[in-house]
Amino acid sequence: MSQYQAVKGTRDIFPEEAAQWKHVEEVVHTLASLYGFSEVRTPVFEYTELFQRGIGATTDIVGKEMFTFLPDPGGRSLTLRPEMTAGVMRAALQRNLLSQAPVHKLYYISELFRKERPQAGRQRQFSQFGAELLGVSSPAAVAEVLTFMMQVFETLGLSGLRLRINTLGDLEDRARYREALRSYFQPYEGELDESSKERLEKNPLRILDSKNPALRDMITGAPRLFDFVKAEGVREFEAVLRFLADRGIDYDVDHLLVRGLDYYCHTAFEVQSTALGAQDAIGGGGRYDGLAKELGGGKEMPAVGFAVGMERLLIAMEKQGLFATLNPHGPLVYVVVQQSELADHGMQVAFKLRRSGISTEIDLAARSMKAQMREANRIRSGYALFVGQSELESGQYALKNLVTSEQTTLELQAIIEILREPSIREGLKA
């Protein structure tokens, strides 16, 4: 064993698990295209103040969880991105996207970094997929983003999901609510944990995020943000709920849901999975109209988005047995060379197959025919194509189905035509 190990909070993903990741990513790419979202990629690190201003200085992410570097040569601190929305908004403002078109629909599958205590589904390097709809934040836009997210879960076969949703109102609503919360919690200050005492002073909304079970009754009795939202905000929220009902999407209105990022306004939501236990949130999002202005954009930009944690999603899928039928095949063909002196000819055959768009593997270690067949079965090859002296002389090659054991002998070009048939994988089902 090497003296070097993966850094705490990171992990390696090998081929079998990588196939599961690829399955999820392909579903995301396909549905993003159906909904009209285009992929965006941003740098893995940004100037630290982007996250301080965008996410909020009082959040746990900024206060405790960011990987921050010594200043760059220009003297500015840099941070590995802990979330995507601030970076996407920075990119949109820098490119001046809304001057090119009134609406932009962007999505991503990206690596992120947070200095958290590693546990199942929570790593220091982790992945998310998500979407950002910029330029419009109407109830229909919120429903569009939510429907996209929920259809990803549905397509993957996930069950036992709970969509929690709330309205956070606008800046004025939340300012009045913060004062009401501060007045409510101050008499209980002696019962609060140290983290909540700090939040009481800086941003009492964050107390509602507390996972301390000793505070649950106190939090449950707190004033509802909904009661501080203006009538217009309530009407918009009710319109979102109607859109969800029309699409057959079940939801629970949760007046304690505030999310952990300061840029959210109006509608916010979170999806939980019963398969995950205590750490049950797999995704969430909401509107963030004020983020553009906070990042120096000059004015508010209507925006709404979501993000889903890939690691937690994959754990939930595994627990529900959703990878049992995935069982991906290896290469379609394994070229079995019967005599070592024919290795060059075997390579030529493999080259022709690959140039014809057929996934092909061939032994590179001059192993015995028996060892090659074991390897072909181990990597789940669909067919074995045999290269021997008789094949070289006759131009006829034996092709064996490694699932059914059926075998046929044909010229190489005829074999290529058969293997290029779109339905060829159907013949590999036992």
From Swiss-Prot:
InterPro entries, alphabetized: aa-tRNA-synth_II, aa-tRNA-synth_II/BPL/LPL, Anticodon-bd, Anticodon-bd_dom_sf, His-tRNA-ligase, HisRS-like_core, HisRS/HisZ, HisRS_anticodon
Pfam families: HGTP_anticodon, tRNA-synt_His
Primary location group: cytoplasm
Molecular functions per Gene Ontology: ATP binding; histidine-tRNA ligase activity
Signal sequence, renumbered to the chain: none
UniProt cross-references to PROSITE patterns, sorted A to Z: AA_TRNA_LIGASE_II
Catalytic activity: tRNA(His) + L-histidine + ATP = L-histidyl-tRNA(His) + AMP + diphosphate + H(+)
Record localization: Cytoplasm
Assembly, per entry: Homodimer.
Family under the similarity heading: Belongs to the class-II aminoacyl-tRNA synthetase family.
HAMAP family: His_tRNA_synth
Name by which UniProt lists this protein: Histidine--tRNA ligase
Species annotation: Chlorobium luteolum (strain DSM 273 / BCRC 81028 / 2530)
Species classification: Bacteria, Pseudomonadati, Chlorobiota, Chlorobiia, Chlorobiales
